[in-house]
């Protein structure tokens, strides 16, 4: 042998050498080759004979080591010989004689076989080509419990696991038939063999208990076609001789750790909580999808008429515990998961809580390895399952098993659920919440592949593995292929768990032999999940074992009914509409979980489910349950709706609410959510009756979620009242939406409550989609919707309660600067809802509210009234506090001066204007109009609405007009995200009243920026512009200085009961604290600067354009309607900057001018501009610029008497209502033309004028600063002592707490004044083309308003001089009374009155206009910044004003520089504002009016036109 072995090795070199010489094959080489082949063959056979150890045989899978084989052979031969010698020596001779007949054999032939089998620890069997067991050794009983007789002549497939059929077939068939791959005669493979059930199992079957099939993993060493047998005859030519032994434990693949999650169900089987902590900790890929699919599968499978989940739940309730059979489902990546649910009935001994069912769901991902927990894989549905666990391709080559084969073969291993069985006994009662979770193809995967699911098949012979009919609920993925054996087993019921649908037919597997291991790689798994749109939330599983893609069931193998069912279910799954499946009513609720909710559940399951384990978790869940009870008390009382949305079931909703609450806390929504919960609970209990809830539900379910879903605050609750529908459903939808809603996504637009509007409503059934609805914003323009007051009969009380108890908290929350956008969204919702509610009230009801508010004449009452403005929430919620002053309910006229308290019937005219806005309650002056939900305003409606609303309140028409400002078409949009409600309430002193709503408007200066105005309409337009322009001009039909306090008082229509002074002050202080504290407010007011700088502050007011910017953002301090205008006047350029037309130009005298133009800005100080310097500046500017009339047509401001000469009374002119778009267009054209023509001229003139004005202003400012400092100090003291009940000047100075930030409601006077575009702006009038806006005499109503508000004719001569200067040009426009009043108050004198004409009806003449004007101006000014000439002029002018009030100092010249484009407006406005401010306190009302007029002319232009002008300036 040695030479023979060595010869080939030596022959190789010879061959290589000869190959060069010999090209053709030689006989010698052929002989050598044959010898080598034969030698290798003999060595192989020798190895098979010598090596009895299977492990050694396995080692032969690779090329055997010849030397090792020969060595072992020699060794064994020697051992045998030595053994024989020893035995012979020990035996007696007699014995030798006795045994001589046996020859020399050491072991008897009969005993050799059993001994060998015992040594091998296995049994021996022979299978012919047909798969029948020809022979089996007797010791098979030790392994499979079957007797030899039972298995003889039976099909081997009856005891083989379905998943191993294909593997066995590959070994049985001749190698020519198996993939054409040659194979050794002997080979080893693994398979699972059925263990005969115990007798106990038989008895259980009779009891209806399905036995769990048990499989034993066996390792088979097979020899096919042995030559010795083949030679003897043909019978056994193709037989397979096998020795089977148990797979050693050490050799068995370690199954991946099982995954589990717990659910908690109520007595109806509805899932109340879900805990996925353990799964989340494992972070295996697709665990969320696994949870969803598990719950879906468990609830979707039916056994006859009852679902398995329901049957399981009933068993738990009956016995206290239950264990479900194994069921299977597939993940999106094709991984088969075997699941089992164990539930126990838990009773709490520590409290009276009702018992609940705790369920533990144990999940095992099937591996593609044959030996892996085969019982787990196979147990799921009995033998019907086709677990493709064996890694060998043979599994995939599955051949059809005999139909008679028992499909219930169970693996020897019971599917062990991690944790005690008690825990396993989780109630599988419908998992409502989770049932809806991502109804993906999990149902498809549900086809049970595990055999553990006992299919009442007694013996393997019993029946075909196939199911006779498709399982009604089993959703077989098209990839799943049913084993032929399983296909028609008559024994197996079509139970949802029946593996039949899921069985993998060996044949089908053969076709997909290469696919059994699909996605074994974790990365592949993740990729597929991603490709299928179900990206794994967790990192992909590291163990590919569980992902065996054995579930390759082809639909072709399924029964037609199964396919049909699959199709229907799959379609449902795709939509996540399990609720529609024919589950029990409760089942539907469980499965009704929406996909979105499922996502939420997936995210929140861990948090919620954490509490589900053990009774201790019950205690943990108490808080959540209480919260649910709190929020859903009414819903619990109501019967569940039958609508699909109700399929979720109350528990579903509750669980969702819990999830939402949990997730919110996790997402840092906790604080706002708590407030929401409180509000919701209170609203639901106090304000919503079943009828109201039904209405809400009707809206929600009928078509779209109403704004209730959009609104996060009590307003949403109000919405609930208004909306009719099934109360329970709606309520749940609303609660869930509110709880789940992301505050950050809320916008005033979302909040603007058009309760009656179905389009704004979200269908509760779409609650899972609420997240999308949340994000969605309502259109800035809302159609006018009138809501009957009957719906809001209880609204007043509710709102009062909310205001007194909760609004302050909400406001304080919303007033945080950083979070103001989010919180203000809530506040906006609340206020808008309240506003709509109030609008829904009859006029008489609103009047009553106004009266109530008026009765509370104190600042607190005003504050309450402002709170009452909640009804005004139709306005952008930026104007939250604007609504505080009932003025918000009225057209938002900023005309109401801080001190002007004279109610004016003229307001009604504005109110009528507001009526045009839609839902304007003309009957209830101001309030109604304001309260009415803002419809999408037409371009011309914005300004007009504000003006119309403003006069609504006879006593506080101005304030009301302000509200309209807020209500500008963008009312639906939050005017200013940063605006804070509470501080505004504090500002409700007379000045505060004007200023509070005004300030709110101003503070939220960027309202318009935030507002979603039509593209052609500058955002600032809608709310603030109106407010800014009109207030100061009586001619505009809005009370220029109608008592702000009165207006505010009227505005609080929403809150019937006046808020207690203490409460209001507390709220205000809370808001102030939120705003960085009183010190911040002081700094904003400029009090420290005033004290330290003295007159320098006055100069700052002029010099600092920042105040304008502040105004643009949200001048919080514009208590005075004119304060904003003053700001604009000073920083008139800056207001131009802010597209929102914040302050037209702050006058140094207006503390408000320091108001923050942008939501994030705060007024640096409240310094009143000196009217004298301002007047001079304005006069110079106006004269130099030839009083350009471009602004007048734009503004349509009756107040446009910007160039007011001291001796000349300005007459307000009203323009006919002009569309905002038209105004914007015209303004843009005018501005562009004017800018082009006058840029250079104006720049030069402005520079000269600015120098002169600066000198004059410095002198005037010094005087004014002294007065203003005194006033401001006094106001600061008042504000601190009275909770920001600051004098108008203080308010105007921007010292008002940011709480006033809440966007002012643009007060557009009803009147639209056709002033020249430059009217009151000091900008040279544009060419005649601007004549369309040529000033039109104010309508009598506007005049009456302006007169009444201005009616004190208290204007100083200086103011009159200013008015005169302007009046020369604009004199006819401006009413003498108005002039006087306008200049009466230094601060308010400058307060901007939104130009009704420009702003439209929404630009009442309330000083609050300034915010809008500020916005508009700021936007306009910003836009106008495009004009460098104006910019320089603005800069020069602003620089001239630096000595002005500190508030204005904040409005630093750089702002003017920024507002270069707006310079012509700003310069004019600022001049006007300055001149108006020059009058000082004596000018309070007139100053405000004139200031506003000046500002309004400027501001009005920006207000109605500037918003649009702003863009044009940009274009210029």
UniProtKB/Swiss-Prot annotation:
Skewed-composition ranges (Polar residues): 508-518, 551-560, 1299-1311
Biased amino acid composition, Low complexity: 1341-1350
Locations listed in the record: Nucleus
Keyword Secreted carried by entry: no
Main location group: nucleus
Region of interest: Disordered: 1-37, 386-406, 457-518, 532-601, 700-727, 775-795, 955-979, 1284-1311, 1324-1350
Residues covered by the PAS domain: 116-180
UniProt motif LXXLL motif 1: location: 628-632
Known tissue expression: Expressed homogeneously during late blastula-early gastrula stages, becoming highly expressed in the notochord in the late gastrula and neurula stages. At hatching, restricted to a few areas including the blood precursor region, prospective pronephros and retina.
Pfam families per record: bHLH_NCOA, DUF1518, DUF4927, NCOA_u2, Nuc_rec_co-act, PAS, PAS_11, SRC-1
Motif stretch (LLXXLXXXL motif): 1064-1072
GO MF entries: nuclear receptor binding; nuclear thyroid hormone receptor binding; protein dimerization activity; transcription coactivator activity
Described function: Transcriptional coactivator for steroid receptors and nuclear receptors. Coactivator of the steroid binding domain (AF-2) but not of the modulating N-terminal domain (AF-1). Required in a nuclear receptor pathway to suppress expression of dorsal mesoderm genes. May play a role in the positive regulation of the circadian clock.
Family: Belongs to the SRC/p160 nuclear receptor coactivator family.
Domain description: Contains three Leu-Xaa-Xaa-Leu-Leu (LXXLL) motifs. The LXXLL motifs are essential for the association with nuclear receptors and, at least in part, functionally redundant. The LLXXLXXXL motif is involved in transcriptional coactivation and CREBBP/CBP binding.
Protein name: Nuclear receptor coactivator 2
Gene from which the chain derives: ncoa2
């Amino acid at each position: 042998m040695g030479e023979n072995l060595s010869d080939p090795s030596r022959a190789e070199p010879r061959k290589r050498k000869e190959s060069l010489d010999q090209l053709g094959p030689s006989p010698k080489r052929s002989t050598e080759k044959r010898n080598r082949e034969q030698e290798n063959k003999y060595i192989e056979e020798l190895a098979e004979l010598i090596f009895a150890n299977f492990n050694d045989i396995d080692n032969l899978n690779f090329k055997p080591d010849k030397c090792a084989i020969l060595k072992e052979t020699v060794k064994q031969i020697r051992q045998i010989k030595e053994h024989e010698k020893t035995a012979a020596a020990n035996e007696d001779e007699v014995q030798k004689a006795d045994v001589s007949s046996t020859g020399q054999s050491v072991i008897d032939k009969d005993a050799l076989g059993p001994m060998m089998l015992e040594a091998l620890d296995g049994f021996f069997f022979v299978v012919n080509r047909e798969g029948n067991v020809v022979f089996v050794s007797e010791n098979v009983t030790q392994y499979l419990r079957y007797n030899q007789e039972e298995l003889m002549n039976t099909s081997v497939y009856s005891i083989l696991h379905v998943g191993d059929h294909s593997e066995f077939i590959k070994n049985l068939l001749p190698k020519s038939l198996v993939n054409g791959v040659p194979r050794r005669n002997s080979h080893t493979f693994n398979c699972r063999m059925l263990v005969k059930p115990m007798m106990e199992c038989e008895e259980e079957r009779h009891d209806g208990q399905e036995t769990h099939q048990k499989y034993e993993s066996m390792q088979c060493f097979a020899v096919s076609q042995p030559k010795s047998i083949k030679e003897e005859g043909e019978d056994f030519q193709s037989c397979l001789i096998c020795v089977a032994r148990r797979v050693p434990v050490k050799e068995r693949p370690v199954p991946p750790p099982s995954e589990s999650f717990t659910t908690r169900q109520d007595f109806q089987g509805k899932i109340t909580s879900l805990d996925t902590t353990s799964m989340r900790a494992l972070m295996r890929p697709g665990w969320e999808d696994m949870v969803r699919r598990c719950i879906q599968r468990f609830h979707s499978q039916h056994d006859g008429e009852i679902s398995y989940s329901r049957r399981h739940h009933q068993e738990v309730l009956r016995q206290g515990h239950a264990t479900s059979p194994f069921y299977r489902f597939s993940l999106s990546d094709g991984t088969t998961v075997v699941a089992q649910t164990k539930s126990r009935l838990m009773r709490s001994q520590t409290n009276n809580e009702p018992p609940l069912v705790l369920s533990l769901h144990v999940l095992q991902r099937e591996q593609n390895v044959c030996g892996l927990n085969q019982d787990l894989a196979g147990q799921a549905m009995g033998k019907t399952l086709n677990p493709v666990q064996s890694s060998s391709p043979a599994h995939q080559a599955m051949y059809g098993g005999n139909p008679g084969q028992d499909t219930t073969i169970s693996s020897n291993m019971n599917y062990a659920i991690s944790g005690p069985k008690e825990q396993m006994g989780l109630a599988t009662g419908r998992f409502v919440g989770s049932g809806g979770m991502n109804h993906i193809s999990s149902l498809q995967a549900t086809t049970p592949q595990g055999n553990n699911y006992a299919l009442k098949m007694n013996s393997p012979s019993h029946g075909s593995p196939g199911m006779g009919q498709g399982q009604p609920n089993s959703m077989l993925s098209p990839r799943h292929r049913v084993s032929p054996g399983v296909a028609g087993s008559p024994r197996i019921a079509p139970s949802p768990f029946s593996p039949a649908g899921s069985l993998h037919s060996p044949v089908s597997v053969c076709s997909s032999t290469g696919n059994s291991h699909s996605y074994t790689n974790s990365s592949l798994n993740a990729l597929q999940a991603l490709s299928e749109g179900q990206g794994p939330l967790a990192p992909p599983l590291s163990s590919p074992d569980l992902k065996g893609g054995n579930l390759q069931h082809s639909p072709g193998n399924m029964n037609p009914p199964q396919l049909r069912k699959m199709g229907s279910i799959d379609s449902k799954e795709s939509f996540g509409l399990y609720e529609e499946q024919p589950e029990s009513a409760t089942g539907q609720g469980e499965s009704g979980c929406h996909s979105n909710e499922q996502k939420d559940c997936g995210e929140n399951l861990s948090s919620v489910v954490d509490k589900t384990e053990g009774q201790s978790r019950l205690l943990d869940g108490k808080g959540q349950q209480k919260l649910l009870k709190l929020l859903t008390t009414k819903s619990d009382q109501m019967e569940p709706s039958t609508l699909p949305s109700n399929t979720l079931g109350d528990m579903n909703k509750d669980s969702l609410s819990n999830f939402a609450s949990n997730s919110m806390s996790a997402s840092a929504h906790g604080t706002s959510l708590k407030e929401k919960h409180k509000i919701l609970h209170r609203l639901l209990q106090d304000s919503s009756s079943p009828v109201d809830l039904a209405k809400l539900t009707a809206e929600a379910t009928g078509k779209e979620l109403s704004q209730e879903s959009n609104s996060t605050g009590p307003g949403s609750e109000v919405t609930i009242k208004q909306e009719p529908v099934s109360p329970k459903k709606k309520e749940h939808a609303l609660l869930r939406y509110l709880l789940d809603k992301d505050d950050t996504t809320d916008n005033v637009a979302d909040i603007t409550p058009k309760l009656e509007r179905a389009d704004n409503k979200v269908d509760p059934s779409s609650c899972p989609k609420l997240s999308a609805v949340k994000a969605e914003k309502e259109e800035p323009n809302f159609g006018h919707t009138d809501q009957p007051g009957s719906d809001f009969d209880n609204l007043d009380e509710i709102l009062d309660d909310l205001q007194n108890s909760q609004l302050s908290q909400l406001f304080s929350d919303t007033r945080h600067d950083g979070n103001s956008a989010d919180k203000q969204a809530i506040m906006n919702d609340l206020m808008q809802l309240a506003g709509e509610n109030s609008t829904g009230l009859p006029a008489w009801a609103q009047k009553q509210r106004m009266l109530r508010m008026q009765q509370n004449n104190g600042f607190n009452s005003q504050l309450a009234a402002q709170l009452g403005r909640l009804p005004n929430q139709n306005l952008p919620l930026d104007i939250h506090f604007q609504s505080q002053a009932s003025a918000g309910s009225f057209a938002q006229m900023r005309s109401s001066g801080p001190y002007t308290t004279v109610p004016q019937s003229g307001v009604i005219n504005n109110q009528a204007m507001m009526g045009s806005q839609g839902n304007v309650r003309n009957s209830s002056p101001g309030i109604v109009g304001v309260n009415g939900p803002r419809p999408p305003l037409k371009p011309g409606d914005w300004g007009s609405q504000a003006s119309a609303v403003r006069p609504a309140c006879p006593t506080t028409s101005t304030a009301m007009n302000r509200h309209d400002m807020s209500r500008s078409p963008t009312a639906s949009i939050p005017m200013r995200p940063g605006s804070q409600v509470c501080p505004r309430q504090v500002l409700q002193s007379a000045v505060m009243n004007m200023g509070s709503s005004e300030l709110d408007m101003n503070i939220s200066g960027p309202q318009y920026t935030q507002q979603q105005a039509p593209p052609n309409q500058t955002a600032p337009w809608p709310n603030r512009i109106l407010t800014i322009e009109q207030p100061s001009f009586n001619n505009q039909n809005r009370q220029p200085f109608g008592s702000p306090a009165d207006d505010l008082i009227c505005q609080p229509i929403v809150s019937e009961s006046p808020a207690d002074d203490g409460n209001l002050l507390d709220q205000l202080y809370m808001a102030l604290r939120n705003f960085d504290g009183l010190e911040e407010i002081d700094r904003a007011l400029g009090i420290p600067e005033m004290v330290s700088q003295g007159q320098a502050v006055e100069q700052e007011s002029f010099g600092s354009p920042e105040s304008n910017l502040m105004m643009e953002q949200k001048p919080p301090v514009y208590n005075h309607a004119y304060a904003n205008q003053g700001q604009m006047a000073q920083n008139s350029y800056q207001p131009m900057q802010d597209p929102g037309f914040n302050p037209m130009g702050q006058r140094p005298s207006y503390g408000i001018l320091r108001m923050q133009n942008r939501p994030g800005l705060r007024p640096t100080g409240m310094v009143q501009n000196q009217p004298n310097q301002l007047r001079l500046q304005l006069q110079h500017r106006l004269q130099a610029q030839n009083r350009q009339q471009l602004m007048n047509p734009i503004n349509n401001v009756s107040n446009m008497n910007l160039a007011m000469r001291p001796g000349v009374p300005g007459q307000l002119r009203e323009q006919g209502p002009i569309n905002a778009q038209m105004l914007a267009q015209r303004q843009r054209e005018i501005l562009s033309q004017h800018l082009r023509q006058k840029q250079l001229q104006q720049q030069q003139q402005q520079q000269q004028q600015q120098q002169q004005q600066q000198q004059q202003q410095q002198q005037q400012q010094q005087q004014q600063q002294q007065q203003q400092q005194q006033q401001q100090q006094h106001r600061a003291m008042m504000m601190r002592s009275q909770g920001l009940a600051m004098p108008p000047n203080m308010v105007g100075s921007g010292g008002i707490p940011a709480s006033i930030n809440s966007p002012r409601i643009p007060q557009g006077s009803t009147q639209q004044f056709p002033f020249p575009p430059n009217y009151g702006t000091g900008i040279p009038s544009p060419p005649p083309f601007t004549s369309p806006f040529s000033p039109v005499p104010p309508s009598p109503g506007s005049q009456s308003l302006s007169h009444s508000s201005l009616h004190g004719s208290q204007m100083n001569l200086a103011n009159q001089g200013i008015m005169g200067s302007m009046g020369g040009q604009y004199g006819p426009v401006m009413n003498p009374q108005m002039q006087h009043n306008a200049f009466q108050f230094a601060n308010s004198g400058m307060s901007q009155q939104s130009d009704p004409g420009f702003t439209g009806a929404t630009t009442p003449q309330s000083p609050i206009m300034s915010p809008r004007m500020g916005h508009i101006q700021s936007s306009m000014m910003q836009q106008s910044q495009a004009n460098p000439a104006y910019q320089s002029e603005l800069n020069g002018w602003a620089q001239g004003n630096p000595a002005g009030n500190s508030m204005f100092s904040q409005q630093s010249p750089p702002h003017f520089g920024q507002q270069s484009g707006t310079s012509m407006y700003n310069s004019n406005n600022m001049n006007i504002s300055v001149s108006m401010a020059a009058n000082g306190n004596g000018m309070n009302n007139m100053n405000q009016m004139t200031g506003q007029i000046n500002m309004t002319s400027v501001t009005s232009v920006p207000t109605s036109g500037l918003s649009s002008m702003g863009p044009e300036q940009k274009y210029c």
